[in-house]
Amino acid sequence: MKICEEMVKLREELDKRNIAWIDKSDIYPKERIEMLKSKGFTEEQSDLTMYRTHFTYKDHFYSVIFGYGSYGGTNPITSEVSGDKLELMIDDNNPQGWLTAEDVLNIIDKA
């Protein structure tokens, strides 16, 4: 799974604002994906890649994710790629999904 366009946009905007971010992505190895596919799983079921961008802004920690199991990423039940949107974790109990990079920036600016 490739990094989504919205995550790239978000990282570029964070750079423009001089907000330091950390890439905490978990890229699933191609060998593991191929092994799972050889066992009958689809590409979508086999690729459990999760892209994560972590940053602190106005004394709040944020985690933005895209990938397997995220809102806007790959649905873990149907294995369908749902789209090119981001999920913002404000805290463990408050995820917000189906966001563009602009949506994420608007949310953090209002916090």
What are these regions (language model features)?
Residues 3-22, 32, 36:
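Amphipathic alpha-helical segments
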Residues 6-11, 82-111:
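Ampiphathic alpha-helical segments that act as solvent-exposed interaction surfaces
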Residues 21-80:
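Amphipathic, interaction-prone secondary-structure segments
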